[in-house]
Amino acid sequence: MKPTLISVLVIIFILRGTRAQRVTQPEKLLSVFKGAPVELKCNYSYSGSPELFWYVQYSRQRLQLLLRHISRESIKGFTADLNKGETSFHLKKPFAQEEDSAMYYCALS
């Protein structure tokens, strides 16, 4: 079985007013086998009430919104739950597919 390559890029700093915000994604590159579960980690620091997003960019395509923390939907099999206690917004999918190969961006506003 050929591994599916899932790339992760970090959007590091966004500033609003005087409060500094930051998102971090520990994995810069992630390879998983087709059919295997995948989890892309996103941790954040923010002193207010965060709005978190996952964006995806497929090869030769524009950046598109995948998920927002308020939607609680499953899009293309992906889900993400906002955990304020752990300050995380991890993107998960139970079974990776070849078409999931893309760049994934976690963003904070």
From Swiss-Prot:
Keywords for this protein: Adaptive immunity, Cell membrane, Disulfide bond, Glycoprotein, Immunity, Immunoglobulin domain, Membrane, Receptor, Signal, T cell receptor
InterPro entries: Ig-like_dom, Ig-like_dom_sf, Ig-like_fold, Ig_V-set, TCR_variable_region
Signal peptide: 1-20
GO cellular component: T cell receptor complex
Location of the protein in the cell: Cell membrane
Domain of life: Eukaryota
Pfam families in UniProt: V-set
Ig-like domain ranges (all copies): 21-109
Glycosylation sites recorded in the entry for this protein: 43
SS bonds (residue pairs): 42-106
GO aspect biological process, one term: adaptive immune response
Known function: V region of the variable domain of T cell receptor (TR) alpha chain that participates in the antigen recognition. Alpha-beta T cell receptors are antigen specific receptors which are essential to the immune response and are present on the cell surface of T lymphocytes. Recognize peptide-major histocompatibility (MH) (pMH) complexes that are displayed by antigen presenting cells (APC), a prerequisite for efficient T cell adaptive immunity against pathogens.
PANTHER family the UniProt entry points to: T CELL RECEPTOR ALPHA VARIABLE 16, T-CELL RECEPTOR ALPHA CHAIN V REGION
Subunit text: Alpha-beta TR is a heterodimer composed of an alpha and beta chain; disulfide-linked. The alpha-beta TR is associated with the transmembrane signaling CD3 coreceptor proteins to form the TR-CD3 (TcR or TCR). The assembly of alpha-beta TR heterodimers with CD3 occurs in the endoplasmic reticulum where a single alpha-beta TR heterodimer associates with one CD3D-CD3E heterodimer, one CD3G-CD3E heterodimer and one CD247 homodimer forming a stable octameric structure. CD3D-CD3E and CD3G-CD3E heterodimers preferentially associate with TR alpha and TR beta chains, respectively.
Name of the protein: T cell receptor alpha variable 16
